[in-house]
Amino acid sequence: MRESWQNNSAWDGAQEEAMRFFTKKRNAPRYEAGELFFCREAQGRQIADRISEMIKSPYEKEGGAVRFQCQGVEFSFAAFGIEDEGEARIYARQELSGVKGYLRNLETAHGNVKRHLLYTIEQCGSVVRVHYSFSRKSERADREKILLAENRMNEILKELRGVRTKGGSALAGPDGRMILDDNGNSKVKNYLPLLEERSQEEGPEEKAFLKEALARRKKSVMQLRRRQIYTPLSLPVIETEREADRRAKHQICGRAAALLTVSLYSECLLGEGMTPSEAGAFVRDIAGRFRAEEFFSPSEKAYLRDGCPDYRTQIQFSWQYENLYVMEWALGLFERLDWPENICSVEECAAKIREFCSLEEFERSVSLRPERELLDAADLYYRLHWACRDAAANGYPLPEKVLPEAAAERRRGLFWAAGCRTAPGETPGGTLEGDGWDQTDLTI
């Protein structure tokens, strides 16, 4: 493992010395072994100070190094941070970059574990070289000393909120259990990075209304963690009920009609092999019955008027069933939003609206959910969308049991319905064509 991540970093040729650090000297008069810790603090002195605070026995401390003895075992901790100066900073950056590159290339069936271990390393700002040794006596006594050393290292690692190497061939947590080894094996069923101790927006000066947004964010983060999906608490909050401009029921009903029309149109092209003119004739009755023309966005109008839309565009608009599902949920036609592990039920979504004879009857028969429910769902899907996009952008394994396209489209629908990040120049009630649907802000 150690050689593998050396090949992923800008090592200066001292590989032989580094490998000796991990080699256990079993037959010498003294038993010696070494491990690495990866911790959050960005300065070696910070790590050394924290370690010295944990030690009850006498110790020596100099800069980022701490030495002490515990029941006949000698320990040495040397910490190097990315905010240190000179060679210490270079070493810390090389090690962190190297182990991250190694993990990227590691083949494993444990995709969630790998992704979350990479996020843990991303949070780290320091590397600690841990060395311990003791005088050999008997095989049993040696095993007891090794166990003592392992327990002491794990106790310190727990306080540092980090991860460590184990035997030079695996990465482990403070409980000593192997998270991943160099063969891609794992001893943990689930693994998640620790929550940040404090988000960047929290503090004594926070405004009262912001507490609502912070509580909503924390709720979403914890919901995702229960599904083994990590998102950082540092991601921005979304609007509060006071700030958001929820769409009116009339707008959401009209948007549902527009989405049903373009979705059916795409289905005719892709699934039934119709020509654009045939597909247009097929959806004409639906569009007229629900006055969809009044609610089409510019991109939807262009798509429906294009005599030869390309395949990619057809696929893009076929995903609008997911947004239709969101609108129908917002209007109370579905009791809950199912987890986006699969696409929504296309047949059921189409049938929900087609039960009504007109837009007016549709609008009279439904009730819009409270702003709070829309914002709760919007916040959750915003963070789920981030998890999918960030994993893809970094080349990490995608979250398991999530269809990224469905998550992205549902986030669009929820942001629009709840009135999050309204389009520039838009006023309450909607003045842009299509009520600003094309301008929905999906940035992270």
Residue ranges of predicted features:
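Alpha-helical oligomerization segments
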Residues: 368-444
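Short amphipathic alpha-helical segments and their helix-coil junctions
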Residues: 236-243, 289-313, 384-401
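Long amphipathic alpha-helical segments with strong coiled-coil/leucine-zipper propensity
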Residues: 247-350
